[in-house]
Every structure is written in C-alpha cells, then in structure tokens.
Amino acid sequence: MQRKHLPVCASLACALSFLALSCDDYDKWTTSPHAILEMSADTLAWDTLISTVPSTTKVLTVYNNGDRGLRISKVHLGKKALSPFRANVDGQSLFQGEGEDFEVRRKDSIVVRLECTLPETGQSGPVRMEDELLFTLESGVQQRVLLSADAQDAYVIRGMVLQQDSVFHTDKPYVIYDSLRVDSGARLTLLPGTTLMFHDKAGLDVYGTLSAEGELGKPVIFRGDRTDRMFPYLPYDNTPGRWEGIRFRSSSVGNTMTYCDVHSGKYGVVCDSTSLETLQLSMENSIVHNIAGDGLRLTGTSAVFANTQVSNTLGTTVYIYGGAYQFVHCTIAQFYPFEAERGDALFLSNHVDSVYNHLYMAHFINSVITGYGDDVIMGSILEGQDYRCDYLFDHCYLNTPAVEDDERYVGVVWDDKEQPLRHEKNFRLFDTDNFLYDFTPDSLSTIRNMAMPEAAALYPNDRLGRCRTCDSIPDAGCYEFVSQ
C-alpha cells in the first residue's frame, strides 16, 4: 500500500527542491559595477513654492531590471541635515538626510517619496534651491537624482479681520488661510501688481470697501495657492474651485476693481443686495475666468462693468436678479470645458418664485454674449406696471434666437446658423487640451466692426491697451482685433 504513495512523495520532493533552487536564485546578489539602478526620473522639480509652506509629495521609483539583486549601502541627500528636501526610501525616512542598507531584488523596485519645505530667502522674487539624492551601491557605484524648487517668500495671513484702512504692497504675494475679512468702515487698498493667493476654503469677504488698483501690465491677481501641477501639462492654477471667491456684503459700497484677474475660484464675484443710491462695484479692464460656480452673481444692487471678460463658469457666467447694471465693451463667454451641464452665459430675472426684485436697469452695450449651444441667454421676467424690468442690448453680439424687439435689441448681430463663424470660432485661441483661451476676435470674426462708435469713445482702448477708436467701426467685446 505504501508503494502507491511513493510517486507523490517523489513529486513533492522535486517540487521542494525546485522551489529551493528558485529561492536561492532569487536571493542572489551582485556587486558588479556594471549592475546599476534605473530611476523613473533623473530630476525632480517642483514649481514655485511658498517659503516655509510644505510642498506636495513627489514619487521616484527605483528599478532593478537586472537578473541579480542589488544592495544599496547608503542613500543620502547631498546637504544631509541642512537640506530643505526630505526623503522616505522604501518606507524608511532618512534621518538627518541619511539612510543605510536598502535592497532591491531582481526585476523589482522600491519607491522613494520626496517633499520639501523651503526657507525664506529675503528676496522679492523666486530663488532656485537645489540638492541631490545620492544612492551608493554595494559595488561603490554612486547614482544621483537632482532635486530643485523655487522658493517664493510671501506674507502668510490666517483668519485676518481688517478693522482699519490697510494697504497691501507688491514686494511679495499674500497667502491667505481661513479667509480675509474687510470689516465695515475699513478700506483695503491693493496696489498695482499685488497678488493674493487663497488656500482652499479661503476667500475675500468685504463688509467695508475694496480698492483694487491694478494697471496695464501690473494686474491685481486673486487666485488659489496651489503652484504645482495636476498633470505635467496642466497647472492647478488653470483648474476651477481652488479657493472660494470675492463677496461684497450688503454694507459694502464704493468698491473699485481695475485691471484685476480673478480666476479658478468656487465663485467669482458676488454682490449682495444694497441700496441703489450708491454704486456698489465698478469693475474695469478685468477678468473673471474659470470658475466652479457663478462668475458674477448680482442681487438687487448697482454695478458698472467695462472692458471686462467674464468667462468659462460651471454655474451662470453672469447672474442678475434685480438691481441696476451697465456692461460696456464686455465679453461674456460660456465655454466651460470641464462639464457639459454648464450654466447659461447670462441669466436675467426680476423675481424668484413669488419674491420680486425690480430690475431697474440691465444695459449691455457693445458687448459679446456667447458660448456653446444655440441659446446661452436665459431669464425669468415678469412684466407689467407692478414689475420694473428695463433691459437693453445695444450693438451686441448675442448667442440666442433672434428677437423682434427694436426697443430692447438695437443694432444686434445674432449668432445664428447664417453666420460664417459661430461660437468659439470667432476667437483667436481655443486650446481645450491645455485650457488656454484668447477671446480676441479672429481676423474673420463676426464680432468685428459692429460696435457703436459713440460708446467706444468712452473706452478708447481695449482691455489690453490696444486702440479701439483707430478703426472707423470698433469691435464688440473687451478686445479689439489686431493683426499678429
């Protein structure tokens, strides 16, 4: 009977013998100087980082593609404990920038995670900082990976409430955590070239007054604080929802925003209801772009917008509910690329359900209102002697079905199927791979040579300083065509 089990025992012995040989082969190591590691990158570079603020983590994969295992005697940072970089090798943090005795089996790999916290430099602009991560093999061969990042000093603000007049300067950006509040009775002045970088869930809350005094070539910038990239081709700064936005409360009047760039927020600019006796906001030569909610949300207040671009929002690009507004030479463009269920380019209303809010004035002059789709202008309007509703489109380019109303639609060009160029084809640059846009009219654009000269004379230069009145007939929108 036992003879019947002999083949089984012999097979088991052979298998164990083979396994032992396989394990022995797997655990063979080499000290040949020709056997080296392969790195997933020879350089790891961070974009500009705020000094003293920890970076995001980058991953380096270290491969051994040879037939024998490799032992790493030492892994260390070139500057060791003085390095602003930190490394974790195969789960082990490098103490004082050094670590010993690592192994990479044949046809295997280990992972290195790297971060950095850059010191303050005392300089106004970015300063390059570099180091090396060095691998010393058991053979004595040394391999290295270059590490680099640019340090940018900044004013770091946490939950600040301004209760008196304040001026922000331009020598370095402001990084804001937990929001910045301008209290009632206080004025915040932002000088030309000032940059405000808001952390996630932080925004600008204005109960007092904001004077953002940008200039051509020196805009005041409102943006998120992420300086790294989502993908190699896509900076986080080009994606929406990085910070909250700007909100003017009911107590806030007399605000001015000139040459401002507001982008990549959860909302753009929100104006709460105020008395119409005093202008709440004047915005000129500015951009509100790439927003995860509404671009402009205007509720029962008064505001003037000129030479301004409002574009690419998940919500409504310009939402108006009651109040008094004027838009002159503005480009309102709804080409939000990240979701198909985007809002309208323009929404006008004087009521929400049974709550009425008189629309005393919504005048659009020499402006462009367009986007994807055949109708991007919507509204909910009650008309009659009890409901004020004064809206006007004067020499505008409109992406909506034509309306026969000579009193409210004057000199309008309709974006319809009869036009040779429609929607995004009217503009110079639409790079939807890298999310780069230039809303300057193309040479054959329908937007060209259609604006009212009398209104253009009020703003003789476009948002980029190009002469608008040098043509016999100016272009609509905030940009004037110039040949490249």
Task: Show which residues each predicted segment covers.
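C-terminal motif of bacterial Sec signal peptides marking the signal peptidase cleavage site
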Residues: L19-S22
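Beta-strand/loop edge motif enriched in small/polar residues
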Residues: D24-T30, L37-T48, V53-V59, Q96-Y437, ...
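Bacterial N-terminal signal peptides that target proteins for export
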Residues: M1-S11
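Short, solvent-exposed loop/linker segments at beta-strand-coil boundaries, enriched for Pro/Gly
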Residues: G78-E98
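Short acidic/proline- and small/hydrophobic-mixed sequence motifs that coincide with surface turns
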Residues: S55-T56, D67-I72
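Asparagine-centered strand-capping/turn motif at beta-strand->loop junctions
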Residues: V62-G66
